[in-house]
């Protein structure tokens, strides 16, 4: 959990200093933010917890977060990070300065055909990317298409989107009536992709004509026009684009154009940039930018190994990983959209097939394409080694020393205070070895035996701690440490920089905030001579009850 702080009179959340309000929505404000260390600008959507609960839109918010976390495309707004406080969620997103396409059309009127085609090509590329990853937007409209400083289109607002499944039909009527397909406003079943095609047709018409094909202040009349599918085609539109519009705005979804049809249309293919529809979409640039890594090291005063470990950990919320992607994305934006392959897609089915990967010598695999690191074993070797023979030895995956515990970036004294509170609540008994090391026991009400464990707080790195759980036996005499400060751990837990804080709302919002990681990160216990029978299970139950209490 993050806390709001003041920075030169301005609100600071995490590493971001908030500035002016960009807009006000149903659930809260969108403010411009600046990363305190890298200086890059972001858009911060502030979602009030109480408001989203009262409006019953928790599912909508979850969908938007899940989808944006999944996507990496040059024409889809990126979600860098979600920061949680007791009162709000802060969605840290890509910032674009050009405003909405809707406002641009209202101000400038219809767009020249060449420019309209360029924007439409970008929009369709993004929609195709969504559909290939089984997501239907369902609320495409000029208000949800943003423009950057170079007049490139970016699709936003995935709150109404749905994941597609084979054989599944959607029936929910959602979105804006002017852009909704006939089957949506009629409440008929629809598969999903075809409703986005209709909306894209309406957007293309708005770009070319400066008006909407179906419009009326009287909603029943508007619905009648949409169901009829009759719209005016101005004389200045050339015949080629007119045929494309008529194909996209077919009332019968079975006769409506598909993305394949649009891509093959002669008007659409003119001046089509190759990066929008790569020939081999399974291949994304699996490279790490050394210059960006060095910049992160300078800004955060950390080592290259720490940055690499953060990227390989696969934790999208890691501060070093977030800063790296901010640098990469801002560089890409400055180069317009020419570096498409730096924005990788979610792993495809062919990723694990070595034959599908063609990595030039000397290039390191991009962390977004890497599976989680695993301990080396005869049956399970890290795919990282197979894909990257040039990986520095210092980053090689070694046989790890596993731990059972919780990782946190809260202050050490705050962590221990929460531990004492939880133990008291559970009726545990404890003995203080030092300020950060406890021996704890609990009596099993059934057997009458005591289950004992050691709790010790380790300093994993300069920003995070590990609260380690260790099973102990009556015969085991723990070595007492004379140190009164948390000790540095050399365990593999340091490779995973998942932040956690103990906040009352974490448990129910775990999937949104990612603020507490009370996970079991290993199963090898440190007991010198563990007893047979139920001792191990009693120990795990004791750990689970403490983790649950800490999460409340």
From Swiss-Prot:
GO molecular function: [hydroxymethylglutaryl-CoA reductase (NADPH)] kinase activity; AMP-activated protein kinase activity; ATP binding; chromatin binding; histone H2BS36 kinase activity; metal ion binding; protein serine kinase activity; protein serine/threonine kinase activity
One GO cellular component, as annotated: nucleotide-activated protein kinase complex
Null mutant phenotype: Mice develop obesity when animals are fed a high-fat diet, as a result of an enhanced lipid accumulation in pre-existing adipocytes but not in other tissues.
Activity-regulation annotation: Activated by phosphorylation on Thr-172. Binding of AMP to non-catalytic gamma subunit (PRKAG1, PRKAG2 or PRKAG3) results in allosteric activation, inducing phosphorylation on Thr-172. AMP-binding to gamma subunit also sustains activity by preventing dephosphorylation of Thr-172. ADP also stimulates Thr-172 phosphorylation, without stimulating already phosphorylated AMPK. ATP promotes dephosphorylation of Thr-172, rendering the enzyme inactive. Under physiological conditions AMPK mainly exists in its inactive form in complex with ATP, which is much more abundant than AMP.
Ranges where the record places region AIS: 291-376
Stated name of the protein: 5'-AMP-activated protein kinase catalytic subunit alpha-2
EC number: 2.7.11.1, 2.7.11.31
Protein kinase domain boundaries: 16-268
Keyword Disulfide bond: no
Task performed by this protein: Catalytic subunit of AMP-activated protein kinase (AMPK), an energy sensor protein kinase that plays a key role in regulating cellular energy metabolism. In response to reduction of intracellular ATP levels, AMPK activates energy-producing pathways and inhibits energy-consuming processes: inhibits protein, carbohydrate and lipid biosynthesis, as well as cell growth and proliferation. AMPK acts via direct phosphorylation of metabolic enzymes, and by longer-term effects via phosphorylation of transcription regulators.
Chain positions found as Phosphothreonine: 172, 258
Keyword tags: ATP-binding, Autophagy, Biological rhythms, Cholesterol biosynthesis, Cholesterol metabolism, Chromatin regulator, Cytoplasm, Fatty acid biosynthesis, Fatty acid metabolism, Kinase, Lipid biosynthesis, Lipid metabolism, Magnesium, Metal-binding, Nucleotide-binding, Nucleus, Phosphoprotein, Serine/threonine-protein kinase, Steroid biosynthesis, Steroid metabolism, Sterol biosynthesis, Sterol metabolism, Transcription, Transcription regulation, Transferase, Ubl conjugation, Wnt signaling pathway
């Amino acid at each position: 959990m993050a806390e709001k702080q003041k920075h030169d009179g301005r609100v600071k959340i995490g590493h971001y200093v908030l500035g002016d309000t960009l807009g006000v929505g149903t659930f809260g404000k969108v403010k411009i933010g600046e990363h305190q260390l890298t200086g890059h600008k972001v858009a911060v959507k502030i979602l009030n917890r109480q408001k989203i609960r009262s409006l019953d839109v928790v599912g909508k918010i979850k969908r938007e977060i899940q989808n944006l976390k999944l996507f990496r495309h040059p024409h889809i707004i990126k979600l860098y990070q979600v920061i949680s406080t007791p009162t709000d969620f802060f969605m840290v997103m890509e910032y674009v300065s050009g405003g909405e396409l809707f406002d641009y059309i209202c101000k400038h009127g219809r767009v020249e055909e060449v420019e309209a085609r360029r924007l439409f090509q970008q929009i369709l590329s993004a929609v195709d990317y969504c559909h290939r990853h089984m997501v239907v937007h369902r609320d495409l409209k000029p208000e949800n298409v943003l423009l950057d400083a170079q007049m490139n289109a970016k699709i936003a607002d995935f709150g109404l989107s749905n994941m597609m499944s084979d054989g599944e039909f959607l029936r929910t009527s959602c979105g804006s009536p002017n852009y909704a397909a006939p089957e949506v406003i009629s409440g008929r079943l629809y598969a999903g992709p075809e409703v986005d095609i209709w909306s894209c047709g309406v957007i293309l018409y708005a770009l070319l004509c400066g008006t909407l094909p179906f419009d009326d202040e009287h909603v029943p009349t508007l619905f009648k026009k949409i169901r009829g599918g009759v719209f005016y085609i101005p004389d200045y539109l050339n015949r080629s684009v007119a045929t494309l519009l008529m194909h996209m705005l077919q009332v019968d979804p079975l006769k409506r154009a598909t993305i394949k049809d649009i891509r093959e249309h002669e008007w659409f293919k003119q001046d089509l940039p190759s990066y929008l529809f790569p020939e081999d979409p399974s291949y994304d640039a699996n490279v790490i930018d050394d210059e960006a890594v060095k910049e992160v090291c300078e800004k955060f005063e950390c080592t290259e190994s720490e940055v690499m470990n953060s990227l390989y950990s696969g934790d999208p919320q890691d501060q070093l990983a977030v800063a790296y992607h901010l640098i990469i994305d801002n560089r890409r934006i400055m180069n317009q959209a020419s570096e498409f392959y730096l924005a990788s897609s979610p792993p495809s089915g062919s990723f694990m097939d070595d034959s599908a990967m063609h990595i030039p010598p000397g290039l390191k695999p991009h962390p977004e394409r890497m599976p989680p690191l695993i301990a080396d074993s005869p049956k399970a070797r890290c795919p990282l080694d197979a894909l990257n023979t040039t990986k520095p030895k210092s980053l090689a995956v070694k046989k790890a020393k596993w731990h059972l515990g919780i990782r946190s970036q809260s202050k050490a004294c705050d962590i221990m205070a929460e531990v004492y509170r939880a133990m008291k609540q559970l009726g545990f008994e404890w003995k203080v070895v030092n300020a950060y090391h406890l021996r704890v026991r609990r009596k099993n009400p059934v057997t009458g035996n005591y289950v004992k464990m050691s709790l010790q707080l380790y300093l994993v790195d300069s920003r995070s701690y590990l609260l380690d759980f260790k099973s102990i036996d009556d015969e085991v005499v723990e070595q007492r440490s004379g140190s009164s400060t948390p000790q540095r751990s050399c365990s593999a837990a340091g490779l995973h920089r998942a932040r956690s804080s103990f906040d009352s709302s974490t448990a129910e919002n775990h999937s949104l905030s990612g603020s507490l990681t009370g996970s079991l990160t290993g199963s090898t216990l440190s007991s010198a001579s563990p007893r047979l029978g139920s001792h191990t299970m009693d120990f795990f139950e004791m750990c689970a009850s403490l983790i649950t209490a800490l999460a409340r």
